[in-house]
Amino acid sequence: MEAGNYLATHLHEVPLIAVFCYNPGIMTITDSDLDRPSVVGGGSVYPAVQNFLLACRNEGLGCVLTTLLCYEEPEIKKILCLPDDWYTCAHVPVGYPVKGGHGSISRNGLEKMVAYNSWID
């Protein structure tokens, strides 16, 4: 959370923010009839965002997927001249890593992240 809060308060210092947008009117939302929030609508944009993140890292750039600007969407839409039927769904601040490079990637082990045949607490 500390890193996210830092980013939120320093977002104006980032040299580039890539803004990914979608139009729900031209997307196929296949789970809208379920009794829960849609997770399919707009989800197809995230593979493109992931490719963008990987390409940035390959070029030595630092970046992170955020949705911080969704809270300011009316202002962002005005700044970017987005049509009324288009919305932002991902915001990727891009710049050179502060410490001059990427550190090692650390993740939880697969056994903590994947369940097979049943839910694991």
Task: Outline where the language-model segments fall.
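C-terminal helix-cap and adjacent tail motif
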Residues: 89-121
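Short, electropositive alpha-helical surface patch
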Residues: 73-88
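Glycine-rich, charged/polar anion/phosphate-binding loops
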Residues: 2-6, 76-79, 101
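GST superfamily/GST-like fold recognition
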Residues: 40, 61-74
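A short secondary-structure junction signal
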Residues: 29-33, 75, 103
